From Swiss-Prot:
Residues 68-113 are annotated as: Mitochondrial targeting sequence. Belongs to the orthohepadnavirus protein X family. It comes from Woodchuck hepatitis B virus (isolate 59) (WHV). Residues 33-48 have a biased composition (Low complexity). This is Protein X. One of its GO terms (biological process) is DNA-templated transcription. Keywords: Activation of host NF-kappa-B by virus, Activator, Apoptosis, Host cytoplasm, Host G2/M cell cycle arrest by virus, Host mitochondrion, Host nucleus, Host-virus interaction, Modulation of host cell cycle by virus, Transcription, Transcription regulation. Residues 24-52 are annotated as: Disordered. Signal peptide: none annotated. It is found in: Host cytoplasm; Host nucleus; Host mitochondrion. It comes from the Viruses. GO terms for cellular component: host cell mitochondrion; host cell nucleus. The gene is X. A fraction may be phosphorylated in insect cells and HepG2 cells, a human hepatoblastoma cell line. Phosphorylated in vitro by host protein kinase C or mitogen-activated protein kinase. N-acetylated in insect cells.
Length: 141
């Protein structure tokens, strides 16, 4: 499993802060990718590049029609890390009204990230921890 990252949206500077989760939680902020940016190849980054991954680099399974694999995202309030939950399961329970899984990708790209930016998402996810999976990384469109 990949290293875990603490992600925090800094709306004052319009950046997403990606920091290693652990005793040393410092790291440079990465700007969010511009809408409509070109997709890159799906090759896996080298270990030396992993600390400089932009926000748009997500596992390829993130945008699959069936949703991300169960190892991709684990979310938790940092105050209660002993009770982490799988993001996919947590989100599915909140979105029981969605007609099909075909809407997963547009929902994540448009609605979820917009809600996060506007600050109207559940406070439990305002700070969350990402895990990794075996899938190669890709850049969001």
């Amino acid at each position: 499993m990949a290293a875990r990252l603490c992600c925090q949206l800094d709306s004052a500077r319009d950046v997403l802060l990606l920091r290693p989760f652990g005793p040393q939680s410092s790291g440079p902020p990465f700007p969010r990718p511009a809408a409509g940016s070109a997709a890159s190849s799906t090759s896996s980054p080298s270990p030396s590049d992993e600390s400089d991954l932009p926000l748009g680099r997500l596992p390829a399974c993130f945008a699959s029609a069936s949703g991300p694999c169960c190892l991709v995202f684990t979310c938790a309030d940092l105050r209660t890390m002993d009770s982490t939950v799988n993001f996919v399961s947590w989100h599915a329970k909140r979105q029981l009204g969605m007609p099909s899984k075909d809407l997963w990708t547009p929902y994540i790209k448009d609605q979820l990230l917009t809600k996060w930016e506007e600050g109207s998402i559940d406070p439990r996810l305002s700070i969350f921890v990402l895990g990794g999976c075996r899938h190669k990384c890709m850049r969001l469109l």
